[in-house]
A protein has these predicted regions:
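Macromolecular interaction modules
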Residues: 1-100
Length: 100
C-alpha cells in the first residue's frame, strides 16, 4: 500500500520569504528523497471551513511506509529535515496517509 506524506503549513509571518525559500531550497531537497514516486506542492487556494490559517501544502508519495521511513532516515532526508526545522518548525503539520 502506498504511503503519502503531507506537509501542511500555516500562514508564515513573511509569505514571500517563505515561498522563495520553499521553492528554491526546500522543494529541491524534498525532490531528492530516495524512493519518492511523486511530489507536488502548491499554495492553499481557499479555506472552506475553519480559521483559514493554512497557507501551503506538499504531497510526497512513496511505494509504501518502509520506503517512506527509509527516505526520511537517508542523508537526503536528514538534510530536508534540518532545513524544515530552520524555516518552518512552528508552521508545519506532517501527516502520513495509507493510499491504495
Amino acid at each position: 500500500m502506498a504511503a503519502v506524506l503531507y506537509a501542511l503549513y500555516r500562514r508564515p509571518p513573511d509569505p514571500a520569504g517563505f515561498l522563495d525559500h520553499y521553492r528554491s531550497v526546500h522543494a529541491p531537497l524534498a525532490a531528492d528523497l530516495p524512493g519518492l514516486v511523486a511530489f507536488s506542492h502548491a499554495p492553499v487556494a481557499q479555506s472552506i471551513l475553519g480559521r483559514g490559517e493554512w497557507f501551503y501544502l506538499a504531497r510526497m508519495r512513496f511505494a509504501d511506509r518502509e520506503a517512506l521511513s527509509a527516505a526520511l532516515a537517508s542523508p537526503e532526508g536528514s538534510l530536508a529535515a534540518r532545513d524544515l526545522a530552520r524555516f518552518a518548525r512552528d508552521l508545519v503539520e506532517l501527516f502520513v496517509v495509507d493510499d491504495d
